[in-house]
């Protein structure tokens, strides 16, 4: 993988990630394909929304179908018939979300298989091996996703263990002679001094890109913005920056304003299945009775298959009848909305008009613009 930074506007960056399997224009949003599928969508449909890269889930694919089944097909690309780049998370977030059925040690995490109750062990080394078999174009290190809230002492211990695990991940990745990219994950909760130690430690080890982890886990938005403003300038300029698990459309806009290149989240697909649809002027809750006789398209500004062919009344009808087609059409639209948003951000950065884009975006959805830190405002001048 190679990253090319093309231009900037303030802290925002316009670039591209170059893989053997294709080019990803950044800033980019990655749809989530937890089990080797973006729920309800064929790979061709996902590609038609403008998606350039997908996220797969190491933990879930390890449990089902398992490494051996994957290798029978070749790798995850062959298994799911997506031939563009794939990023896989390390499994850390899922393991640490298991709560009482897992035990953390220096070596890794012991836990009960949530499917059949078997005792399983996942370590940095094992995570690298699974992701190698998946053929991931971007491999994520195995780390502890520090919960929120966490006091400073706990966050420090967690971050320091994640750094030790980062070294072990790097070593095993290299031993496997994996020619793809390996990203480090910056931890430290909401504490700037701990984030500083994490960034420096990861840069000293050396990675192909750097993710900001441990955000979007319940902390106030102001803390997320503050940490991004503090951390992003410390990441080497020639390496991509990835904000994990984020998020709402406005979170993507704010991440881009602060220098983030990559995002992922289940929100557009999960919300689609619940009838919560993102449009240019905000949100349409399609199961609301007021849409039962609305013959207008979902979003007159959108060029997706759903908006070109169907009315709000039809989508409302499908939702009320629990028809599978409704979830599919909603998902097509929400994913296209996210990709159109990212394309708009990329164009605005290219033209040096990002803040004009931001003003228009917030006016349309009827929300105030979160302030940038003074140093970030200065960077835009």
From Swiss-Prot:
One of its GO terms (molecular function) is metal ion binding. It is an enzyme of class 2 (transferase). It catalyses: 7-aminomethyl-7-carbaguanine + guanosine(34) in tRNA = 7-aminomethyl-7-carbaguanosine(34) in tRNA + guanine. Transmembrane segments: none annotated. The active site is at residues 89, 264. Keywords: Glycosyltransferase, Metal-binding, Queuosine biosynthesis, Transferase, tRNA processing, Zinc. Binds 1 zinc ion per subunit. Catalyzes the base-exchange of a guanine (G) residue with the queuine precursor 7-aminomethyl-7-deazaguanine (PreQ1) at position 34 (anticodon wobble position) in tRNAs with GU(N) anticodons (tRNA-Asp, -Asn, -His and -Tyr). Catalysis occurs through a double-displacement mechanism. The nucleophile active site attacks the C1' of nucleotide 34 to detach the guanine base from the RNA, forming a covalent enzyme-RNA intermediate. The proton acceptor active site deprotonates the incoming PreQ1, allowing a nucleophilic attack on the C1' of the ribose to form the product. This is Queuine tRNA-ribosyltransferase. It comes from Pectobacterium carotovorum subsp. carotovorum (strain PC1). The gene is tgt.
